[in-house]
Amino acid sequence: MKILVDENMPYAEALFQQLGDVQAVPGRPIPLDALAGADALMVRSVTKVNEALLQGTSIRFVGTATAGTDHVDDNWLQQQGIGFSAAPGCNAIAVVEYVFSALMMMAERDGFQLRDKTVGIIGVGNVGSRLNARLQALGVRTLLCDPPRADRGDNERFWPLEKLVREADVLTFHTPLNKNGPYQSLHMADDELLAALPDGRILINACRGAVVDNTALLRALEKGKKLSVVLDVWEPEPELSLPLLARVDIGTPHIAGYTLEGKARGTTQVFEAFSQYLGQPQSVELASLLPQPEFSQLRLNGELDEGKLKRLMHLVYDVRRDDAPLRRVADQSGEFDRLRKHYQERREWSSLCVQCDDAASAELLQKLGFSTQLL
């Protein structure tokens, strides 16, 4: 059995070789000659999986090591009897930590306490729900907007988008990309929403580029709209708008979910799904795959405050490390993908064990996702 895996999926070759012959290939584009005789295809979000790619091939299973699936025509796969699995939630923690890093950077730059802000979370799925829990643990007021969940009668208080826009200091988007239907999210942040957004707000998009109308956003900023903007995703990719990049506060090359843990979860989830599909179910212990981080232990003396928390978070990951490289090379063809392909190893907060002599601080750090040890 021939299994194609994206060359940037960590641990894929080692895992999938237990099930067949593995060939690592670039994801954008998939070499058509590699598809000849292949039985399974494991991709990331850079690969468009549809009839144009797979018609006439022998592929019988597709796995995507990503939470989002808008790059996959799963309806066509189903019609063809091709098995399919994604990796929901695999990078949710990574995206949450990206958002925190960006907010902490802005808090330091602009002289505010995150606890004093109201954060509007648009899309309360795997990412949004985790972000909500961690913000609430820190004492931050959150407002939630999720029309599908609201219509199902889920046990949360959900806000209409138009009201949330007026109330929240921060808008952070965590929705799938739905191009039509009752829950369309394509260009959710359009001219109308941006006009309604009061000056001085923070707008973050770390889900799908087209959820925010990039042309409308650039137009608003050029006309003097006073917003702090964080964009990890762009419309389109990889040919992002250079004028927009020049005006945002933080711009990164679609790497919010790119922790080593998040990537490894994506690989292991599709590996387990494919092994189940073959009738050879296997499970993988994530910790057995991961190397020791550069910083694995640190002692915190006294009570945790927001300044100390920012330093802890930025010790593990500071979003500014990904902003500067993109600005240096964004005007060069192929560099957006190169930054993603050769992304510097990044770990999650859980990789750092913080030794605490204060029980309340240890409890809070645990709720935020750090490993802790009470002295």
UniProtKB/Swiss-Prot annotation:
It comes from the Bacteria. It is an enzyme of class 1 (oxidoreductase). Pathway: Cofactor biosynthesis; pyridoxine 5'-phosphate biosynthesis; pyridoxine 5'-phosphate from D-erythrose 4-phosphate: step 2/5. Keywords: Cytoplasm, NAD, Oxidoreductase, Pyridoxine biosynthesis. CDD domains: ErythrP_dh. GO terms for molecular function: 4-phosphoerythronate dehydrogenase activity; NAD binding; protein dimerization activity. The active site is at 208, 237, 254 (proton donor). It catalyses: 4-phospho-D-erythronate + NAD(+) = (R)-3-hydroxy-2-oxo-4-phosphooxybutanoate + NADH + H(+). GO terms for cellular component: cytosol. NAD(+) binds at residues 146, 175, 232, 257. It holds the Pfam family DUF3410. One of its GO terms (biological process) is pyridoxine biosynthetic process. It is found in: Cytoplasm. InterPro entries: D-isomer_2_OHA_DH_cat_dom, D-isomer_DH_CS, D-isomer_DH_CS1, D-isomer_DH_NAD-bd, Erythronate-4-P_DHase, Erythronate-4-P_DHase_dimer, NAD(P)-bd_dom_sf, PdxB_dimer_sf. Substrate binds at residues 45, 66, 258. Its EC number is 1.1.1.290. Catalyzes the oxidation of erythronate-4-phosphate to 3-hydroxy-2-oxo-4-phosphonooxybutanoate. HAMAP family: PdxB. Belongs to the D-isomer specific 2-hydroxyacid dehydrogenase family. PdxB subfamily. Homodimer. This is Erythronate-4-phosphate dehydrogenase.
